C-alpha cells in the first residue's frame, strides 16, 4: 500500500486560463499526502465522454474560480462521484448549496477542520442491531412499606353476579268486535242540487253583443249617402297656382346662397339648376383666355420676325429659366444684348 492517497482533480473550464492555480492546488494536496492520479475537465465528465471507475479514489477535489455561494455544479454528477470514491473517501470543493443532494447520496458533511463531504461506509449503514425485548414483570412488586400490591382478577361468567334483564312482552291492543245492534249512520239528500251553466250564458251574451254592434254599423253606412260628397282630384288643384313651382328654396340672408345641395336622386329640378350655373361659369372662363393658332404654335427663335414669348427671366441665368428655355446652359446676360459664340467662349 502506497503512502499517498489516490486523488481525482476535476477542473472548471475557466481555470484553464490560470495554470498557476492548478499547480498550487497540487502542491497543497501533496503536503497532505494526496496524489492526483487523474485530472479531467468537469464538462467532459458531464457530457459522458469520460467515465469514472467505481471505488477508485480516496479524494476528489473540484477546482473552480467561483465563490462558495455562487457555485454551479451538475447535480447528477454527485452520485457519480459518490460511486467513484472508496468508503470514508472525501469530496472537496462543493458548498452547502448541494447539502440535500449530498445527504441523499450517502455523504456526511464535515465542517471542521476543513469543510468537506465524507462518504459513509455502506457496510456499517446496513449492519443489523439487535434490540432486547422487554420481559414481563412479575407481580412481586413491593411498596416501600414492604407490602405487596393488591392483585385483581378478571371477572368470568360464572363468578359475575350482574343482574339479568328480560325483554317484556308487548301489550296486546284491545280488539273491538262489531255487534248486530250497532249500525253506522246514513245520510240522504233532501233535494237535488241545481246546476247553473254560467259559461254558456256568457258566451251567448258576447255573441249577441257582437251581432248588435255589426248591425248598428251596417245601419249607419246605409243611412250615409256618399255619392253627393265625393271630391275629384282635379278639383283640389288651384287654376291660378297650377303653373307655379310648389317647392321653395331656402337661401341664406347674408350671402344669398343656397344652403342645401341637390340630392343624388334629385327630382325637384335643383340638380339641373346647379349644372346650368356651372356651365355658365365655365363659358365665362373660356372667354377670358383664348389663344389663336399662331399663339398656340411652338416658339421657334430661329425664325426672324417671329413673335417670341417668355417668362422674362431668361437673362437671369439657369436658376430662373423654364424647363424649355432655349438659353439653358448659357450664362446670364443683359436684356437686348446680342449673344454670339465669342461672348461665351470663356464658358465653353
UniProtKB/Swiss-Prot annotation:
Calcium as UniProt keyword: no
Motif (Cx2C motif 1): 311-314
Co-factor requirement: [2Fe-2S] cluster; [4Fe-4S] cluster
Region (Linker): 159-242
Name recorded for this polypeptide: Fe-S cluster assembly protein DRE2
Stretches the record annotates as Disordered: 137-170
Role played: Component of the cytosolic iron-sulfur (Fe-S) protein assembly (CIA) machinery required for the maturation of extramitochondrial Fe-S proteins. Part of an electron transfer chain functioning in an early step of cytosolic Fe-S biogenesis, facilitating the de novo assembly of a [4Fe-4S] cluster on the scaffold complex CFD1-NBP35. Electrons are transferred to DRE2 from NADPH via the FAD- and FMN-containing protein TAH18.
Keyword annotations from UniProtKB, A to Z: 2Fe-2S, 4Fe-4S, Cytoplasm, Iron, Iron-sulfur, Metal-binding, Mitochondrion, Phosphoprotein, Ubl conjugation
UniProt GO cellular component terms: cytoplasm; cytosol; cytosolic [4Fe-4S] assembly targeting complex; mitochondrial intermembrane space
Motif Cx2C motif 2 per UniProt: ranges: 322-325
Binding site for [4Fe-4S] cluster: 311, 314, 322, 325
Protein family (similarity comment): Belongs to the anamorsin family.
Other notes: Present with 1050 molecules/cell in log phase SD medium.
Reported phenotype of the disruption mutant: Inviable. Decreases cytosolic iron-sulfur (Fe-S) protein assembly.
Molecular function via GO: 2 iron, 2 sulfur cluster binding; 4 iron, 4 sulfur cluster binding; electron transfer activity; metal ion binding; molecular adaptor activity
Ribosomal protein keyword on record: no
